Amino acid sequence: MSNPSIVIASAARTAVGSFNGAFGNTLAHELGAAAIKAVLERAGVEAGEVDEVILGQVLPAGEGQNPARQAAMKAGLPQEKTAWGMNQLCGSGLRAVALGMQQIATGDAKVIVAGGMESMSMAPHCAHLRGGVKMGDYKMIDTMIKDGLTDAFYGYHMGITAENVARKWQLTREEQDEFALASQNKAEAAQKAGRFADEIVPFVVKTRKGDVNVDQDEYIRHGATLDSIAKLRPAFDKEGTVTAGNASGLNDGAAAALLMTEAEAARRGIQPLARIVSWATAGVDPQIMGTGPIPASRKALEKAGWSVADIELVEANEAFAAQACAVNKDLGWDPSIVNVNGGAIAIGHPIGASGARVLNTLLFEMKRRGVSKGLATLCIGGGMGVAMCVERL
């Protein structure tokens, strides 16, 4: 018996906020709730019809029990429905969609909301004090750096893995800066043209000066120039090539997708954004974690029965320009179809949400262009990648 066709009935995301920016005091589950509500409203599905919510999140410390459940309840799902969070680092938001697809394919659910959420701004500092401190100072650990951005095997920052990739793939500082500039310029043009408007659900932030409606990505740098990027010093290795300008940011945001079978969508009169054709995850050396999309994309393409030449649009997360350039070179796809509206270097990288964010951006741009076959992929800390092939019906 063949598996049923699983479709993405609707998708939505919040804007991406800068570190300590518009969402600086907003908890991740509040952003997640907004994305959940939006996908239900866009598809005309009642909250009580959702079987389960699955949300990726990398930095849940201090947010209370099961932030995914908090997001689901805040979005109006009845208490009888369930929700849970998962963590595959930067791939979490896309892996959550794959998990939702699997639950529907096995008959364990009919309707799933899946995606990711993250507040890097609200990630707390912590200290291990249960054994007591007899005297003297005690070091606080930044959970954002420790749990989100430091390699667990070699003990260094993700930026060093990008330096490793740059050396192994012989990528110059100039190549990386030019890639970063292109990302910024494409994102600026897309934002000015309103091309992100269909993706983004406005989110109201309450401030002492009144309510602020956040409906634009905050991190995109308008007017970026090669000269301004080239002036930045290396951020992780003083002799290196990776800078704050050719790396993604620290960001806040959420994104979600509503999943069901193609038959269920037809029964409800819903025109899906796309069907999920295949997905895959793969491991690589943690020292070059940014190359994870290379084997993951190849596996997903093989499972789909596609070749690289079949792909009409790609969203490949830009953790760093170095790894993004290496992925493009090794996979050999047409760079003109990759991140056509800019990527994470410009838009930002709220780590647990980014997988669902790139999927959202891919789906809406495929619809806008009228193309059929697309691929979303991300590198993952610890030496992994995840990829998904989708097809418009």
Curated annotation (Swiss-Prot):
Reaction(s) this enzyme catalyzes, per UniProt: 2 acetyl-CoA = acetoacetyl-CoA + CoA
Record's GO cellular component terms: cytoplasm
Domain of life: Bacteria
Enzyme class: transferase
Keyword Acyltransferase among UniProt keywords: yes
Pathway: Biopolymer metabolism; poly-(R)-3-hydroxybutanoate biosynthesis; Metabolic intermediate biosynthesis; (R)-mevalonate biosynthesis; (R)-mevalonate from acetyl-CoA: step 1/3
E.C. no: 2.3.1.9
Subcellular location as annotated: Cytoplasm
Any GO molecular function: acetyl-CoA C-acetyltransferase activity
Active-site residues, record numbering mapped to chain: C90 (acyl-thioester intermediate), H349 (proton acceptor), C379 (proton acceptor)
GO BP term (any one): poly-hydroxybutyrate biosynthetic process
Stored Gene3D superfamilies: 3.40.47.10
Subunit structure: Homotetramer.
Protein name per its UniProtKB record: Acetyl-CoA acetyltransferase
